[in-house]
Amino acid sequence: MKKKLNLCPKGTYDFFGQGAKIFIDVRKVFFNQAKKFNFSYIETPIFEYANIFLTTNQIADIVSKELYKFFDKSGRELALRPEGTAPIMRSVAQHKLFQTEKKFFYFGPMFRYENPQKGRFRQFYQAGFEIINYKKDSLEFQILEIILLIKSIFKDLGINEYEIKINFLSNLTTRNIYKKNLAQYFEKFSDKLEPISKIRIKKNPLRILDDKIEQEKEFVKLAPKINTFWTMEDKNIFNRITSILEEFKIIYKVDYNLVRGLDYYDDFVFEFIDTSQTLGTKLALVGGGCYNNLPTKFGLNNFKSIGMAFGIERLIEIIKSKKNIKEQNLDFFLLSFTDKEILLNFKLAKILRKENFLVDLNKTPFSVSKGFQLAKKSGAKFVFFFEKNQAKNYISLKNLQTGKNEQILYTEINFEYLNSIIKASENA
């Protein structure tokens, strides 16, 4: 079937208007918060060698079912990145960025071939924070910083309807014992499991706990819990973590079935779940945890790391539902009726933009009536224009909301005054 040229691919979208404005505002919040918490921005390629993901997430759905893979003209197998942590770890190993503890932040598009639905796309944006190569005895403080950072971001975004879920997956040895017990348990219910989960019994039964369909089944809810396999050291670590969260009055819920969707997570994991019902179901807004075994895939041993990633589209949906986001209106429209006035207004526009005012102007002369129609359609708060028989070095300034008209000295513009009238119009 011939595809229409005027449709974007399934699972993708265009940002414009209100959505684009919110996206820019959200991105600004993330960059500001990253700076406040001393995270350095890192940019990795949108595509990587496929084995970076095939090696680090062999059983995860994002590799087994959702990875966009292709071969280049030289026969190298590449993949569009489905997540941001593995590429950052590759970069850390490649550039030897591991001499001391590092704090990285990223913001960009990811790609997964999954069924598009509300809050899920095939191209989607993630913002992520990673703390790499921290000291083992500082785990609870690393977790505290991550949680406080998330709460600070949500506060700036005006998002306050969520619950925090946490779990502790222990180390590889304990987890393997737990997985063996899970497999034995789920074998008894194999006839009630989805086809993919029957495969997971042998490959990684933890994935069954993470499956949205399986989670609703009673026998899955009653499956063995990881905490019954904790060592005394695990219990002590978990108690230190919860104690420090309580010290900072952070409300959380322990969910022993929480495992996260990527294979490399261990020790502490968490999710912030939306409770606003905006997304139609309780989806994670941000999730993450420790990934101490992932660095070994890149030749980095004894390398403690923790991180998390936000789903940007989900945040945008919630922000859209919470308040009426106004389009970014111009401060001033510079209206010209002659070519000479266009040149003068270009000079004025340069001056105003230098002072951070939002400005536009017409580049073709208009009649008075059509010119003011254009100015009103632009959404500007005020319009500058030259009147007939205007006093020398003066220009007229009209408030498009009130209709008030005044004369401004063109050669000595009072920026403080302009700022005050803009602010007054926004509060009107």
From Swiss-Prot:
Top-tier EC class: ligase
Keywords from the named record: Aminoacyl-tRNA synthetase, ATP-binding, Cytoplasm, Ligase, Nucleotide-binding, Protein biosynthesis
Pfam families, per the entry: tRNA-synt_His (PF13393)
Molecular-function GO terms, alphabetical: ATP binding; histidine-tRNA ligase activity
One GO CC term on file: cytoplasm
Annotated EC: 6.1.1.21
Superkingdom, taxonomy of origin: Bacteria
SUPFAM superfamilies found in the cross-reference section: Class II aaRS ABD-related, Class II aaRS and biotin synthetases
InterPro entries given in the database record: aa-tRNA-synth_II (IPR006195), aa-tRNA-synth_II/BPL/LPL (IPR045864), Anticodon-bd_dom_sf (IPR036621), His-tRNA-ligase (IPR015807), HisRS-like_core (IPR041715), HisRS/HisZ (IPR004516)
Annotated catalysed reactions: tRNA(His) + L-histidine + ATP = L-histidyl-tRNA(His) + AMP + diphosphate + H(+)
Subcellular location: Cytoplasm
GO biological-process terms attached to the record: histidyl-tRNA aminoacylation
Family: Belongs to the class-II aminoacyl-tRNA synthetase family.
Quaternary assembly: Homodimer.
Annotated protein name in UniProt: Histidine--tRNA ligase
Organism: Mesomycoplasma hyopneumoniae (strain 232) (Mycoplasma hyopneumoniae)
